[in-house]
């Protein structure tokens, strides 16, 4: 793959090649063609330049999934500035941290709501403006308006460079301190091309974005990969995922695929079981990423919606995609595997940096043009992550004889019970094969005898009744004795991140905090 490509260059090429095809649709309201979207983005970029935004400046954005957000995101990177998307649900204290850590110069929000972000920006003396798109298909208006006169010529004179940092995000992994991840035009361009290639995205495709666009999964896999392919993207009218409107949106836009985290797949499945739609669109594939998908859930999805479910493997530091199960015509998928590397080198290394043979586990390591050059202002994290010429993901996995990657778990999440290393993903899969369980997550807890013991939290299916003894009996039939959870928490909800991911650290802290005598484990630094 060429190392001189840029995301903005790919978007311009698509706008020229597929000028009259639909690019963005807002459910039940309006749509923009690829050419019109490019015009609106260039105009918004001219406003940012007139407002003093320049090369390398960090611009924070906090919006629901709206057309204004997409336009402003693309306009920021067109200016050779850095987009720093933030979750609108953050508290004022969280906004303070993220705005400060990213060194944001400007905050852009909708005219109403998100008061916590405004308060944080004010406290940090960061300029705040609002963005609106009157009528949905007009031109962006900023308030207050720029002091200087805007000029499209100034935008045309800009040349985006592959080395330009365009996106700044924070990780939300197993450590408690989020790490800042700068991603360049080359990183983003490489990733979207990888996604387009492995799923054969084209101008004939269409999808509904169900994930928040402040996260790489929704932004890169759902939105940007579609745009560079000339595809169409529908935004739900509510600005976020809604199970009640999901299939009507999919049918209305002639969707051919969608991507989601396992939690959303389960919500979609549960609605199908309890309130099925009269008809479903014919999908080329369903994609799952950002957390492990149990084979039983994959099977139910395929049976219910008649499309192959392709599980993928991704992380922020790789500008999202690292590996994916291929389409049926390219080799097919393996339940329980996250597929083959896509557009980058991948190796399974031991602690000394030596490659492991197929079937032997080690740390998953990658290198390629999609991978970040390093965390911002964090030499300790960079030293740990970049060794032997590879980026170390912190995940344990192995390749099978066919070259498919199987993940065992996060290094810091593997449960060490008296010297036996247990994969919580394996325990999850068994729990989710129970016919009366809708969701489940296993996690490690401190134990005086074994060092660590296994607990789990489960959500029963609607209308089902389960008890702890029944769940434990099921586990004893399907797991080795040392892998059986010691305690089962039965609940109606699990704590999730803003992107719908279930993190074991957070789940463990949540349930152990309910037991006054429990010692809450310490994870990471």
From Swiss-Prot:
CC annotations in GO: cytosol
EC number: 6.2.1.-
InterPro entries noted in UniProt: AMP-bd_C, AMP-bd_C_sf, AMP-binding_CS, AMP-dep_synth/lig_dom, ANL_N_sf, Pcs60-like
Domain of life: Eukaryota
Pfam families for the chain: AMP-binding, AMP-binding_C
Protein's GO biological process: fatty acid metabolic process
PROSITE patterns: AMP_BINDING (PS00455)
Binding sites annotated in the UniProt record for ATP: 171-179, 311-316, 395, 407-410, 501
Keywords assigned by UniProt, alphabetized: ATP-binding, Cytoplasm, Ligase, Nucleotide-binding
Principal EC category: ligase
Ligase as UniProt keyword: yes
Subcellular location per the Swiss-Prot or TrEMBL entry: Cytoplasm, Cytosol
Molecular function, one GO term: ATP binding
Region SBD1: start-end pairs: 242-311
Region SBD2, residue ranges: 312-375
Domain remark in the UniProt entry: Both substrate-binding domains (SBD1 and SBD2) are involved in the substrate recognition, and are sufficient to confer the substrate specificity.
Similarity comment: family membership: Belongs to the ATP-dependent AMP-binding enzyme family.
Protein's name in the database: Probable CoA ligase CCL9
């Amino acid at each position: 793959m060429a190392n001189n490509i840029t995301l903005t260059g790919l978007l311009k090429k698509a706008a020229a090649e597929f000028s009259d095809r639909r690019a963005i649709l807002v459910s039940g309201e309006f749509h923009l063609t690829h050419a019109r979207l490019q015009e609106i983005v260039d105009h918004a970029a001219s406003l940012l330049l007139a407002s003093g935004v320049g090369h390398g400046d960090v611009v924070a954005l906090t919006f629901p999934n709206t057309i204004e957000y997409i336009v402003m995101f693309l306009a920021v990177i067109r200016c050779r500035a850095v987009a720093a998307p933030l979750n609108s649900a953050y508290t004022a204290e969280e906004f303070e941290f993220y705005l400060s850590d990213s060194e944001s110069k400007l905050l852009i929000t909708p005219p109403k709501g998100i008061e916590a972000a405004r308060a944080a920006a004010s406290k940090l003396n960061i300029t705040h403006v609002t963005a609106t798109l009157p009528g949905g298909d007009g031109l962006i208006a900023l308030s207050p308006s720029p002091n200087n006169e805007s000029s499209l010529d100034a935008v045309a004179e800009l040349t985006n460079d592959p080395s330009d940092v365009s996106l700044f995000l924070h990780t939300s992994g197993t450590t408690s301190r989020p790490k800042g991840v700068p991603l360049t035009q080359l990183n983003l361009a490489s990733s979207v091309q990888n996604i387009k290639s492995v799923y054969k995205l084209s101008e004939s495709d269409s999808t509904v974005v169900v994930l928040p666009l402040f996260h790489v999964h929704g932004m890169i896999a759902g939105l940007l990969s579609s745009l560079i392919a000339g595809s169409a993207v529908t935004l739900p009218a509510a600005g976020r995922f809604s199970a009640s409107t999901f299939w009507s949106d999919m049918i209305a836009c002639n969707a051919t695929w969608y991507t989601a985290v396992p939690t959303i797949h389960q919500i979609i499945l549960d609605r199908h079981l309890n309130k099925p739609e009269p008809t479903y669109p014919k999908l080329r594939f369903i994609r799952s990423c950002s957390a492990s998908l149990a084979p039983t859930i994959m099977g139910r999805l395929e049976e219910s919606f008649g499309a192959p479910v392709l599980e993928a493997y991704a992380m922020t530091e790789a500008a999202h995609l690292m590996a994916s199960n291929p389409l049926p015509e390219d080799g097919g998928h393996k339940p329980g595997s996250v597929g083959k590397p896509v557009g980058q080198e991948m190796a399974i290394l031991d602690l000394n940096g030596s490659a492991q043979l197929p079937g032997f586990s080690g740390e998953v390591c990658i290198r390629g043009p999609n991978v970040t050059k390093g965390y911002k202002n964090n030499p300790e994290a960079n030293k740990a992550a970049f060794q032997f010429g590879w980026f170390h993901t912190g995940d344990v996995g192995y390749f099978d004889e066919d070259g498919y990657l199987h993940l065992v778990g996060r290094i810091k999440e593997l449960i060490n019970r008296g010297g036996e290393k247990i994969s919580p993903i394996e325990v999850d899969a068994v729990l989710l094969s129970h016919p009366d369980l809708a969701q489940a997550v296993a996690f490690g807890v401190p134990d005086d005898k074994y060092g660590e013991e296994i607990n789990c939290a489960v959500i029963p299916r609607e209308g089902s009744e389960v008890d702890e003894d029944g769940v434990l009996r099921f586990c004893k039939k399907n797991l080795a004795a040392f892998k059986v959870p010691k305690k089962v928490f039965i609940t109606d909800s699990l704590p999730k991140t803003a992107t719908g991911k279930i993190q074991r650290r957070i789940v463990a802290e949540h349930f152990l905090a309910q037991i006054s005598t429990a010692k809450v484990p310490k994870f990471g630094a």
